[in-house]
């Protein structure tokens, strides 16, 4: 299962590959995932342009020019690729977005535990409401020794469990 560093790396790579690119064609091969891919993607995504890609927790948010975003979580076996559009379809490829530069964004998952869904953003650069319950982002100034000290008061238990719980709030 990709952890935060992998999600950060994937987000940075997708930012370089997608920002400024326009979606020209959409194919949903297999909508059965942890959260089913909607057939509406076929009608709603062509013509949209990627304006930003960022990470929040272990999610990658690929923001579009219409106030929506593709929200991705890679689960245990999710993979994204941006490669030439003429590369043959792989067995576990679920979503295929052809870009205006001749490449394609491909979302694959062998176990179908991943998430790739279209969601509305409350504001440009924001996070989808689905992520409102997540804790403090560990790569920001808000997260540090002082924060951990404050939230650890009155708690007893294993350090790893505490950290996992704090990071999930």
Set out the residue ranges of the language-model regions:
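A cross-family signal for N-terminal binding/gating loops and helix N-caps
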Residues: 1-108, 112-114
């Amino acid at each position: 299962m990709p952890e935060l560093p992998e999600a950060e790396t994937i987000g940075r790579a997708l930012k370089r590959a997608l920002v400024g690119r326009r979606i020209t064609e959409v194919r949903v091969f297999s909508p059965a995932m942890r959260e089913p891919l909607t057939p509406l993607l076929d009608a709603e995504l062509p013509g949209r342009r990627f304006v930003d890609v960022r990470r929040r927790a272990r999610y990658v948010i690929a923001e579009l020019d219409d106030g929506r975003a593709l929200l991705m979580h890679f689960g245990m076996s999710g993979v994204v690729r941006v490669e030439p559009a003429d590369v043959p379809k792989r067995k576990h490829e679920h979503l295929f977005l052809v870009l205006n530069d001749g490449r394609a964004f491909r979302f694959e998952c062998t176990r179908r535990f991943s998430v790739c869904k279209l969601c509305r953003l409350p504001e440009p650069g924001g996070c989808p409401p689905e992520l409102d319950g997540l804790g403090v982002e560990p790569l920001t100034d808000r997260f540090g020794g002082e924060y951990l000290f404050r939230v650890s008061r009155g708690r007893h238990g294993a350090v790893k469990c505490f950290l996992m719980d704090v990071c999930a709030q």
